[in-house]
Amino acid sequence: MKRILTVAIIVLSSYLQARAQEKMKPEETEIYSPVPVKVKPGAAFRDAPSDAIILFDGKNLDQWVNTKDSSAASWIVSDNAMTVNKATGDIQTRQLFTDYQLHIEYRIPSNITGSGQARGNSGIFLASLPWGPGGYELQVLDNYDNATYVNGQAGSMYKQAIPLVNACLKPGEWQTYDVIWTAPRFSEAGLLKSLASVTVFHNGVLVQNNTTLLGDTPYIGQPAYRKHGAAPIKLQAHGDKSEPISYRNIWVRTL
């Protein structure tokens, strides 16, 4: 009964928040303290296990499409990595997923410029949705020596969950995210039955520990849930002017 009541409260809260979001400013959902402690990660990359679905092996983008029109993904493939093409926008997987384990590696270029949110910004949307903020975003950003609001730094679930620590490596080094994603569940009528949850290891260090989400991850306003099923995984081409980042060695295991 307590769980049902909690979910009902969240549903009502999501509705009321959605009505108020248009009047909010981005700064109203930015948190600047406490700042997560920096830790130094170990060095290790993980090969895909035998039951993994390979989403990117460094050769082509066959498993990806452009988000805006579902055409063939047009990011740049070179040296076993894909680099964001900011001119063509986000890309997402052809395949849809519900619950899964994800491994992905990314690199902020060594010549990165900019500051705050305009420095190596990208994002991994653990379920890409065609409305609102576009889903549930795990932030990608250079925060090795770059301050920003802490619920928007690398390792955060954007504007919703601050990372436990700052495990960022220097620009120019390959970094890893290992994610366990459990999608939200909805009734046939669209009522929320269970919240989304996520566990994230950043460069082998725990930064999100079975974190439950109150909804999607908007830039402006409060999170909200809306009924959806299985969804693609999306990589963001952020509109900031800093040099584009790269990804490699992406695989997923369905759970």
Give the role of each language-model region.
Residues A20-L255:
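Carbohydrate-interacting regions of secretory-pathway proteins
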